[in-house]
Design a protein with these regions (language model features):
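A short, polar/proline- and glycine-enriched secondary-structure boundary/capping micro-motif
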Residues: 13, 20-21, 46-51, 76, ...
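Generic preference for well-ordered secondary structure
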Residues: 45, 73-75, 99, 113-116, ...
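Surface-exposed amphipathic alpha-helical segments
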Residues: 3-8, 53-69, 110-139
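Signature of long, low-cysteine stretches enriched in small and polar/charged residues
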Residues: 4-26, 59-106
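A short acidic-to-branched-hydrophobic micro-motif
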Residues: 23-56, 103, 114-115
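Coil-to-beta-strand transition motifs
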Residues: 32-34, 84, 98, 107-115
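Short beta-strand segments enriched in hydrophobic/aromatic residues
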Residues: 41, 93, 118-119
């Protein structure tokens, strides 16, 4: 449930990583609030290392998602979503930007979902974020 009509874009196919398809849907609700979901299909998400420890894969992906510099992790949690491994985390960027990003990552077989919301740290709109994150349905 996006707070508006999402823009859709296809991400380029990356042969070197085995990514077959990527899709991004996003809404810039206001100049300082954005909602997005991205997913990729790839055989690498079914690989033995990922299957052996999906939460380790999600933790490594979290580490790669956080920008260097003033970003600070303010929340992180392992979880599941419809029985699939999931992880949620949030980081805040101080300084002039003073924004935060909340992520929810889900590893569902050969598909990797990333939902995220970008917002002003001082104005997080947790109810809107919860509605957006909880509206995802895996069919």
């Amino acid at each position: 449930m996006f707070p508006g009509i999402p823009v859709t874009t296809n991400l380029p196919v990356n042969v070197s990583t085995g990514t077959n398809a990527g899709h991004l849907f996003y809404v810039n609700y206001t100049p300082v609030n954005s909602f997005a979901i991205e997913y990729e299909d790839s055989a690498k998400f079914m690989g033995p290392d990922v299957k052996k420890s999906p939460q380790e894969f999600l933790q490594k992906t979290e580490n790669l998602s956080i920008p260097e510099g003033p970003a600070k992790i303010v929340f992180e949690q392992e979880s599941t979503f419809d029985g699939y491994p999931a992880r949620e985390f949030e980081y805040a960027v101080g300084g002039k930007g003073n924004y935060s990003v909340r992520y929810k990552m889900i590893l569902a077989g050969g598909r990797f979902y990333v939902l995220y919301v970008i917002f002003l740290t001082a104005n997080p709109h947790p109810a809107d974020r919860a509605i957006f994150f909880n509206s995802l349905s895996l069919n």
